[in-house]
Amino acid sequence: VKILLLTRYDRLGASSRLRSLQYLPYFQSLNWQVDQEPLFSQAYLCNLYAAQSTWKDVLLAYMRRFKALTRVGRYDLIWIEKEILPFFPAVAERLLKTRRIPYVVDYDDALFHRYDLHRLWPVRAVLGRKIDNVMRHASLVVAGNQYLADRARGAGARRVEIVPTVIDLDRYPAPVPRSEAADRPLVVGWIGTPKTSCYLHPLKSVFASL
């Protein structure tokens, strides 16, 4: 089996690392060939997290993605994280359907609201139903939770499976019970990004109570 994995990021991106890349050793053990092509580079994320200009990185990212699309015919399956080209109509996904190349699409958050709830009406008008179209034509939609799965089913997806975002317990083993580590501070790991860490702020009181 030959799979082209079109991730959003490389390993520095939490969603790509936890939704697909951590499973690659397992697929390799099945003798599956999985070729990863990230959209955004490590340099892009480093610049983004440092609040530096990223427009050159974005331009290069789209050029790399267009180049990757010229090779889709070599694969049995295309595995897409979220969408092929952000803020573009679903032309690339329709191309796969036209060429009868099956694709699986994975969502770990409500990306569709980036378009259908966008503050600018032209974006809502042109891209508001984009993700629904991507879901509808996918051979499989992998959803991180029930909300995403319901959206996929409502969009007419043929098959939907819920796979929550999890961590690899070989890398992050179960902690020592608190009763055995009362003299040590509680350490909470954040698997998100600096850009999304703001969502932790409303939970300060919860962490303090621990």
Locations of regions flagged by a protein language model:
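Short hydrophobic "strand-cap" motifs at the C-terminus of beta-strands
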Residues: L6, G144, V188-G192
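An aromatic- and histidine-rich active-site surface loop
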Residues: R8, I78-R100, V105-D106, I191, ...
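Carbohydrate-associated surface elements
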Residues: Y147, V166
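Acceptor-binding helix/loop patch of EC 2.4 sugar-transfer enzymes
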Residues: F40-Q52, Y103-D132, D168-P173, A182-R184, ...
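Conserved catalytic-core segment of nucleotide-activated headgroup transferases in glycan assembly
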Residues: R11-Y26, L30, D35-Q36, D168-Y172, ...
